[in-house]
Amino acid sequence: MLFRSYKKNLIKFVTEVKTKGATPILVTPVSRRKFKKGVFSDSHGVYPEIVKEVAQKENTLLIDLQAKSADAISKQGDEKSKQWFNYVAAGTNPIVPDGKSDDTHFSETGAMKMASLVVEGVRELNLKGLVQNLKR
């Protein structure tokens, strides 16, 4: 049920953007950090595929951030990839005295890395009027 409304809403957004004369770009969800026995594992299920399907059906540009981020996180490995996420050791931060292990939300370093992957995707699409305005 949720999948259908997700797809329906994506199509609605794409249609509305095109109606206004703009160029929509769909982006698959960024990967969460999930390793099983040291091997990176996807945790988004069908959502990235729905985005790809809508992009194809609606003839819309796509940045596959799920694939790009999964590759980057996997290459970093189980331990080193933690620096990209909100990991706080117990006793090091008064706001979270017991520490925190968050494999969904990014640290500043991780957010910058994910943003660079989006920029990479925009460059690959080679959109005139957009690419030349990118700083990196």
Question: At which residue positions do the language-model features occur?
Answer:
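Short glycine/proline-centered loop/turn elements that form peptide/ligand docking sites
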Residues: 12, 28-29
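Alpha-helical scaffolding segments of alpha/beta enzyme cores, especially the outer helices
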Residues: 8, 12-15, 19, 46-53
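Loop/turn elements at helix/coil->beta-strand transitions in domains of secreted/extracellular proteins
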Residues: 18-25, 57-61
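Alpha-helical packing segments of well-folded alpha/beta enzyme cores
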Residues: 6-9, 13, 114, 118
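Catalytic His-Asp segment of secreted/periplasmic serine-dependent ester chemistry enzymes
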Residues: 29-136
